């Protein structure tokens, strides 16, 4: 009987001393994943607003597919996205972004899936001194196990932005 009692005490102390897992009971693991992924997305926006394409590229998977906002536009890859961004940077200075990040949801269950949605308001100075304007946009990012963006959807008024970017200088 004494051996059984000692065994129970040893077992109880082992159970009591085990370390707590990184997630608490009841916490959705996809919300934990969202928080990890949102740090990456936020860092990518900061790098982009600094016009630092080298750093920005580190947050993107080599296999990324970017689904642009242009009507009839085709999906582009990482090299094309970086080239397009470099052209964009020639048109603007002093890029500022206000970013609100929210968890993405599974289309069937409508529960968090670890992806990241971003509501963004952009402002910048156009090199041609066109009138300053804010551009509201929406993005959806899916990240891989290495926390790199592999799928990128974007929604914004492309034609309106180009209209302002090519406008006559403000007087």
Language model segments and positions:
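A solvent-exposed, acidic/Ser-Thr-rich amphipathic alpha-helical stretch
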Residues: 54-108, 112
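A short, structured loop/turn motif at beta-sheet edges
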Residues: 107-114, 142-149
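Exposed beta-sheet edge and beta->alpha loop/turn motif
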Residues: 117-146
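A mature extracytoplasmic/lumenal domain signature
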Residues: 60, 70, 120-122, 145, ...
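Hydrophobic pocket/interface hotspot
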Residues: 44, 55-57, 64, 81, ...
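Low-complexity, intrinsically disordered terminal/linker segments enriched in charged
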Residues: 150-171
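Sec-dependent bacterial lipoprotein signal peptides
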Residues: 1-15
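Short, low-complexity N-terminal intrinsically disordered segments enriched in polar/charged residues
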Residues: 17-50
């Amino acid at each position: 009987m004494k051996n059984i009692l000692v065994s129970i005490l040893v077992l109880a102390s082992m159970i009591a001393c085990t370390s707590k897992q990184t997630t608490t009971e009841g916490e959705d693991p996809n919300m934990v994943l969202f928080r990890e992924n949102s740090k990456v997305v936020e860092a990518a926006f900061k790098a982009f607003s600094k016009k630092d394409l080298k750093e920005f590229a580190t947050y993107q998977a080599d296999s990324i597919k970017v689904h642009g906002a242009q009507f009839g536009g085709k999906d582009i890859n990482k090299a094309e996205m970086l080239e397009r961004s470099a052209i964009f940077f020639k048109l603007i200075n002093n890029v500022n972004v206000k970013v609100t990040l929210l968890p993405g949801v599974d289309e069937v269950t409508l529960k968090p899936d670890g992806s990241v949605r971003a509501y963004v308001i952009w402002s910048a100075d156009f090199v041609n001194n066109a009138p300053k304007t804010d551009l509201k946009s929406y993005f959806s990012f899916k990240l891989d196990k290495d926390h790199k963006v592999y799928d990128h959807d974007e929604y914004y008024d492309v034609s309106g932005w180009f209209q302002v970017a090519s406008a006559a200088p403000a007087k």
